[in-house]
């Protein structure tokens, strides 16, 4: 993360990749930034691809990266997807289904036998693990290594885990997607996405579709993503320590009815996660006692923790997910928590005062 993506040619700026304002180049190997990217995005792709021993392609957002995978499917395709995926991905899938473009098989991510069956019948198997916001972990070693129908693509959204905690390509996945907006960037100041694969044919298809969809990352965004990625290991180490401690304390609090964090032995997929994840991430969800209004009240009373959407920054954020359109199936008292790098006792003091209020 620290050494990759640096130009070591004598006389070149080693410390940071240059940000070039020009959107075109005099004819050579690179002509136009929408089709060919920039030297800054090249450096970013070297860095991110190296994290998973693959080849990376950067995008203007995580949703742009996801759309390139989904919209490559021809009419009549079948997609296997978790019951409660990220709502943006669900929006694309639901729209395509309503238009008759594809059929959708919605599966409990913990139901490994169902996913193994899907490998024999579906054109795309889309896994999101840990899943947003219930934190269900898929059995990636079993699913990704299982026999599949010729042409079936296994894609893994690894945003919550990051490459530091799981390596889907090593397990047999075809492509990994990250919303680099989140933990890779890490400072809540950019939009970016990435696809990583070891399949050169897929990589070139993704590159062509990135060109067609105008989804190439900007130079400044690529620069910011590189800057953020340099410290990801340090940030994740601190955030995961905080997350584990908060999960333990919240689980013991009388005003909390349930905590969903893969690192807790009480989590339904903890045993699966422990077999292949090297860390459990900085994302969790918990449910308050009472009704949905109680969860909203807790969010509004927090002083240090930000009540806002998005996640993965150095600051801790929380959000009541059931109020998001399309997320009505989520328990009304569930709050998703993205744990940051603050002092854990400061965070806990904030929770105590918010939960103590009537």
Question: What spans do the regions from the language model cover?
Answer:
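Conserved PLP-enzyme active-site core in the AAT-like
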Residues: 3, 7, 56-253, 260
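Conserved N-terminal alpha-helix of the aminotransferase class I/II PLP-enzyme fold
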Residues: 16-72, 84, 88-97
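PLP-dependent enzyme catalytic core of the Aspartate aminotransferase-like
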Residues: 100-103, 116-117, 140, 235, ...
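Short amphipathic alpha-helices in soluble, non-transmembrane regions
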Residues: 206, 296-303, 350-355
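Short conserved active-site loop signatures built around small residues
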Residues: 1-19
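Short loop segments at secondary-structure junctions
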Residues: 23-24, 197-202, 229, 288-293
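Conserved C-terminal alpha-helix-loop-beta "cap" of PLP-dependent enzymes
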Residues: 258-335, 339
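Short gly/pro-enriched beta-turn/loop segments at secondary-structure junctions
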Residues: 13, 219-220, 252-254, 278-281
């Amino acid at each position: 993360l620290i050494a990759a993506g640096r130009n070591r040619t004598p006389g070149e700026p080693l410390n940071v990749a240059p940000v070039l304002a020009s959107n075109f180049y005099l004819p050579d190997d690179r002509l136009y930034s929408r089709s060919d990217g920039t030297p800054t995005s090249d450096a970013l792709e070297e860095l991110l691809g190296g994290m998973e021993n693959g080849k990376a392609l950067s995008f203007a957002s995580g949703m742009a990266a996801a759309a390139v995978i989904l919209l490559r499917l021809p009419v009549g395709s079948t997609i296997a997807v978790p019951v409660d995926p990220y709502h943006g991905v669900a929006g694309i899938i639901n729209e395509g289904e309503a238009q008759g473009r594809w059929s959708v098989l919605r599966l409990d991510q913990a139901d490994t036998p169902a996913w193994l069956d899907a490998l024999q019948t579906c054109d795309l198997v889309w896994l999101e693990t840990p899943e947003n916001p219930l934190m269900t972990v898929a059995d990636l070693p079993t699913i990704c290594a299982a026999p599949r129908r010729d042409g079936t693509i296994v894609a893994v959204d690894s945003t919550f885990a990051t490459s530091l905690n799981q390596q889907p390509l090593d397990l047999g996945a075809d492509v990994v997607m990250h919303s680099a907006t989140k933990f890779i960037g890490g400072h809540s100041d950019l939009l970016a996405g990435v696809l990583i694969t070891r399949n050169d044919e897929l990589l070139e298809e993704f590159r062509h579709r990135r060109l067609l969809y105008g989804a190439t990352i900007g130079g400044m965004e690529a620069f910011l993503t590189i800057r953020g990625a340099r410290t990801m290991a340090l940030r994740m180490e601190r955030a995961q320590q905080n997350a584990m401690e908060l999960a333990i304390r919240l689980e013991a609090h009388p005003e909390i009815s349930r905590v969903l964090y893969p690192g807790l032995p009480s989590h339904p997929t903890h045993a699966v996660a422990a077999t292949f994840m090297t860390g459990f991430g900085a994302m969790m969800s918990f449910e308050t006692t009472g009704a949905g209004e109680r969860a909203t009240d807790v969010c509004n009373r927090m002083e240090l923790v930000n009540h806002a959407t998005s996640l993965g920054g150095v600051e801790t954020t929380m959000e009541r997910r059931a109020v998001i359109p399309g997320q009505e199936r989520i328990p009304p008292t569930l709050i998703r928590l993205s744990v940051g790098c603050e002092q854990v006792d400061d965070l806990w003091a904030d929770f105590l005062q918010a939960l103590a209020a009537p």
